[in-house]
UniProtKB/Swiss-Prot annotation:
Entry GO MF terms: sequence-specific DNA binding
InterPro entries from the UniProt entry: Arc_rbn_hlx_hlx (IPR013321), MatP (IPR009390), MatP_C (IPR035375), MatP_N (IPR035087), MatP_N_sf (IPR038339)
Keywords linked to the UniProt accession: Cell cycle, Cell division, Cytoplasm, DNA-binding
Keyword Cell division applies: yes
Family to which the UniProt record says this protein belongs: Belongs to the MatP family.
The protein's name: Macrodomain Ter protein
Species per Swiss-Prot/TrEMBL record: Cronobacter sakazakii (strain ATCC BAA-894) (Enterobacter sakazakii)
Amino acid sequence: MKYQQLENLESGWKWKYLVKKHREGELITRYVEASAAKEAVDLLLGMENEPVRVLGWIDQHMNPALQNRLKQTIRARRKRHFNAEHQHTRKKSIDLEFMVWQRLAGLAQRRGITLSETIVQLIEDAERKEKYENHMSTLKQDLQALLGKKE
């Protein structure tokens, strides 16, 4: 495994994930009967700061259909947590309008590179163009000075 598992921290993440899913209306317990499900959820809500009990609750009460999604969520969260420790692996997010994202994704796909690489290429292209335009402007001014013309 690439990233160290931190039981207490990850238990907190699991608790938050399950509470979020419950608030979104998903069935987080294995119980069909509403009263048993409510009782189990109330028990979970009461153990926010008790990581060992959260793991026990998961083993005893959690809906088996959530098992894989919970594992994937925690694995992704663990990766983001450890990557955030180093500036070069830290990820940032930006908000894009859908049409902008769609065009950027299409360009990235045509070039066969990631969205980040596409953005870097576009920035480098713009910087080269700006440098070229400045160089051409300077050459034009120098040429006009040599020819003795004023604008």
